[in-house]
């Protein structure tokens, strides 16, 4: 029988399973994978926590794998305060939106870099907005920030609304929830210093993600509000 190849991974979520085991959701370059970790209270079980880079050996052909081996693969991103809530938010997005066992190697790399940046104390909002956009893009839900639904260039003096199923649509009358063309063009260039860019990015990503997340509130978002 072929020996499974260890692969890099992070723990997204874990919970007790039967008497001494844990059911663990991992994020790997091969996607989100669920596996049973037996003897979860052993030394290996101490690694089952978020933001720790791991090397895991997963066995089995079904959707529910077994952890054959697990080791630390580097220094954990020690997140505190708002950075911790931000990391938990990223994990919850991945748990809610990633299909099981669909490869996302580029997203995995971006996730790793984002955790490192959070641990280094980088400003949170640009990191979160960049990750949300990358996630939408990887899942096939992204839209152009430089062209509207009619294939016209986004105008700096224009007003736009998001049609989640299509993209940005120019409107003539001001109404709540619109985006200025200057803001959208700044986001297209990841120019977070532009006036209104960060706030517009937060509103835009929330609108874009909402339809895919559904009505169930994000636990991490509620925790952040109550901090």
From Swiss-Prot:
Keywords: DNA damage, DNA recombination, DNA repair
Gene Ontology BP annotations: DNA recombination; double-strand break repair
Signal peptide: none
Gene3D superfamilies the UniProt entry points to: Nucleic acid-binding proteins, Recombination protein O, C-terminal domain
Domain of life: Bacteria
Family affiliation: Belongs to the RecO family.
Known function: Involved in DNA repair and RecF pathway recombination.
Protein name (Swiss-Prot/TrEMBL): DNA repair protein RecO
Gene Ontology cellular-component terms listed: bacterial nucleoid
Keyword S-adenosyl-L-methionine in record: no
């Amino acid at each position: 029988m072929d020996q499974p190849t260890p692969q890099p991974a992070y723990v997204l979520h874990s919970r007790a399973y039967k008497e001494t085991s844990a059911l663990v959701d991992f994020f790997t370059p091969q996607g989100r994978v669920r596996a049973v970790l037996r003897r979860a209270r052993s030394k290996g079980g101490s690694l089952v926590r978020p933001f720790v880079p791991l090397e895991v050996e997963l066995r089995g052909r079904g959707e529910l794998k077994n952890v054959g081996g697990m080791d630390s693969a580097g220094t954990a991103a020690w997140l505190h305060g708002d950075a911790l809530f931000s990391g938990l938010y990223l994990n919850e997005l991945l748990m809610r939106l990633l299909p099981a066992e669909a490869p996302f190697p580029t997203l995995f790399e971006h996730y790793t870099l984002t955790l490192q940046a959070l641990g280094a104390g980088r400003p949170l909002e640009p990191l979160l907005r960049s990750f949300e956009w990358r996630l939408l893009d990887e899942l096939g839900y992204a839209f152009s920030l430089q062209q509207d639904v009619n294939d016209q260039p986004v105008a700096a003096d224009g007003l736009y609304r998001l049609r989640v199923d299509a993209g940005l649509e120019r409107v003539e009358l001001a109404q709540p929830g619109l985006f200025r063309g200057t803001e959208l063009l700044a986001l297209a260039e990841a120019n977070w210093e532009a006036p209104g860019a960060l706030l517009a990015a937060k509103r835009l990503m929330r609108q874009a993600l909402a339809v895919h997340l559904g009505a169930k509130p994000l636990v991490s978002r509620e925790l952040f509000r109550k901090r």
